[in-house]
């Protein structure tokens, strides 16, 4: 596999900061290290996903929604991935049957946290509120179609990604594990997330839903 070049890709997909922001943090004015900085941005973004057990980019659109399947562990509630815009919820009675049961918002199910959409946050849980219950005896019995992730990347995530990407880039140039810049200060580098990054991301951590 050939290494991506600037001509092929000036910015990786699904990342949480920009080349310009990291350049500025590192006080780099030329483009000689752009590919390495982009690799650091991509790695930092995926480290953030892993730490938070969620992704902050958007999957799908209303015109082309994404389908995910879930295995309920309770008849009354279902933990799901971050959902921005649900378009359809269906269930089936067993593992191999068709998804014939359609769930309607406010009559069959509620989305929680209920106030999240008003503040630009996704919903993460479904509640069964009427006669239907989630079929939890078999795996992958709930099918949800919609737009997933976050409408906009939270500011704390953007800042965390810039800090972590800067550290990853500087790390390869610092064999003794110590580096510094005017903006970052003197730092001891290691393979973990920066403590400030962890603090920024703390409120965004969650337990991951059972999607397949």
Describe every region a protein language model picked out:
Residues 1-212:
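Divalent metal-cofactor coordination and adjacent catalytic microenvironments
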């Amino acid at each position: 596999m050939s290494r991506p070049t600037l001509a092929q890709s000036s910015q990786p997909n699904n990342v949480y900061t920009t080349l310009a922001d990291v350049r500025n943090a590192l006080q780099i004015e030329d483009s000689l290290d752009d590919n390495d900085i982009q690799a650091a941005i991509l790695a930092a973004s995926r480290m953030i996903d892993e730490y938070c057990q969620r992704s902050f980019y958007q999957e799908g659109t209303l015109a082309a929604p994404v389908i995910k399947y879930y295995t309920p562990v309770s008849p009354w509630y279902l933990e799901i991935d971050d959902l921005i815009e649900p378009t359809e919820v269906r269930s089936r009675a067993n593992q191999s049957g068709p998804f014939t049961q359609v769930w309607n918002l406010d009559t069959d199910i509620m989305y929680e946290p209920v106030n999240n959409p008003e503040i630009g946050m996704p919903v993460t849980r479904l509640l069964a509120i009427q006669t239907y219950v989630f079929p939890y005896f078999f795996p992958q019995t709930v099918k949800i179609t919609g737009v997933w992730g976050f409408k906009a990347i939270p500011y704390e995530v953007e800042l965390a990604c810039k800090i972590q990407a800067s550290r990853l880039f500087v790390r390869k140039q610092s064999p003794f594990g110590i580096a510094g810049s005017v903006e970052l200060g003197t730092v001891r580098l290691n393979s973990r997330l920066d403590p400030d990054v962890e603090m920024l991301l703390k409120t965004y951590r969650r337990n991951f839903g059972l999607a397949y």
